[in-house]
Amino acid sequence: MQDFVIGQRWISAAELQLGLGMVIEIEHRTVSIVFPATGETRIYARADAPLTRVKFRVGDWVEKQDGDLLRILELTETNGLIVYRCENEQGNEIDLPEGRLSNFLQLNQPG
């Protein structure tokens, strides 16, 4: 069984077109994920959810919810949530909590 934490970003392996989902509720046997890009919510059995944790790598480019592009310099994980240390196109460094990643990212092969 996968470990879920409210606020984590996941994708549905069966429905990549939903974009990035966010854990909004965890029950004993189920996990609820909202997919803001489509406005849909799914409830999955925790034991066999077709979900893949989204975890970008150093050097990857990601998009914030406001559309800014950032290059990942490092990442830290605390209590199951990732904060990316990034550099914007002007060379300024900022911290980007995973919850502020663009909801419209669509992944073909999750990292």
Language model features with spans:
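Short aromatic-glycine-enriched beta-strand elements
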Residues: 19, 29-33, 80-85
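Intrinsically disordered, low-complexity, charged/polar segments
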Residues: 39-67, 79-81, 87-111
